[in-house]
C-alpha cells in the first residue's frame, strides 16, 4: 500500500473522495489498510462528515444472562470481547460493533441519541461494585464517562436521552438530570412526585412523558403524565396529567400500553394490545399503534398489526415493544424473529435475531454517525 499512487494524493483530495461515500462504505474502507484507517479516523475527516445523515439502525440490549466475561473450568474469569448487535432495516442485515475500546467490564447499552450509545459499565477494579454511565461512539471508538452515580441508579433507574444529549435517570421517587452546561459536570437531583412507577418514559422537546397506573390492585387505569424541564433551579419536578374530554376511553381500550418517541419532536406513540372487551382480564384482538400530536393533543391510529402476524404474539405470554420514530419493533418469547412496523412500508418479519435463546429481546434506535464526542 505504501507504493500505491493513492499515497501521492494530498489529504484534502482524499477527504473529498471518501466523504462522498455512504457511512457503510467508509466503515468498510477503514478496515482495508492502516493508511485508510488513519485517514478515515482523523479528526479533520470526522469533522467534515459529521453533518452527514446518520444510519438509522436498531441496537439490541444484551440478554440478562449475557456478560463480557465468563468463568472457565479452573474458576478464573475468561474475558470475552464485548459487542453490541445492530440491525440495518434498509439493508435487512445484522452485524455488530465491538465495545472492547471501553475500559469497563460487562457494558450494558441502554439508550442512544445523536450517534452516541449510553451504557452502564462495571469498574475494572473487581474490589469495587460501582457502575458508571458512559457515552460512547462505537464508530469512532471514543467515549466519555459521566459523573459518578450510585449502583442503585443502574438497578432501578431508566436512562433517557434527548436529541441534544441531555440525560435523565428516572425512578418513581427521584430523577437525576445532566446536561453538562446547567451545572458543570454535575447531576441535578429532583423528587419525582409520581403516583406510581413510571412506565416507558420518553424525553423529548424539553419534556418527559410517562405512563402511570393509577388504578386499583385488581384493575389497571393508565394515565399519561408529562413534566417540562424548564426550571432547573427547583428541587422537584411538576408532573401534570395530560387528558382531554375528547379522548374518551382511549386508555381503556389498550392493554399494557407503552410509549415510544414518534417522528420528530412533536409526536408520541402509544402501543399496546387492543382489548376485545372491557372485562377485568380481556383478550386482545391485535396490537394497536396510536400517535399523539403534542401540539394539538389529538390522537390518531398509526398502525394495526395484521391478524396473521398477531397470532404469534397471541400465543406468547409476554412481548416487548421498542424502537421509535418511523419504525416500531416487537419481540415475544419463543418467537425467534422480530415483527417490524414501518410507517411508510407497513409490517414485516425480521429473521436471524442473534443472541437470544428465548426470543424476548429489547432494543433502542441507534442513529449511527461518525461524529466527535461533545
From Swiss-Prot:
Upper taxonomic lineage: Eukaryota, Viridiplantae, Streptophyta, Embryophyta, Tracheophyta
InterPro entries for this protein: F-box-like_dom_sf (IPR036047), F-box_dom (IPR001810), Kelch-typ_b-propeller (IPR015915), Kelch_2 (IPR011498)
Top-level taxon of the source organism: Eukaryota
PROSITE patterns: FBOX
The protein's name: SKP1-interacting partner 15
Compartments, record wording: Nucleus
Domain-related comment: The F-box is necessary for the interaction with ASK proteins.
Gene Ontology biological-process entries: protein ubiquitination; ubiquitin-dependent protein catabolic process
Signal peptide: none
Entries under SUPFAM superfamilies matching the protein: F-box domain, Kelch motif
Alphabetically ordered keywords of this record: Nucleus, Ubl conjugation pathway
Assembly description: Part of a SCF (ASK-cullin-F-box) protein ligase complex. Interacts with SKP1A/ASK1, SKP1B/ASK2, ASK11 and ASK13.
GO cellular component, one term: nucleus
Residue ranges constituting the F-box domain according to the UniProt record: 3-48
Gene3D superfamilies: 1.20.1280.50, Kelch-type beta propeller
Pathway listed: Protein modification; protein ubiquitination
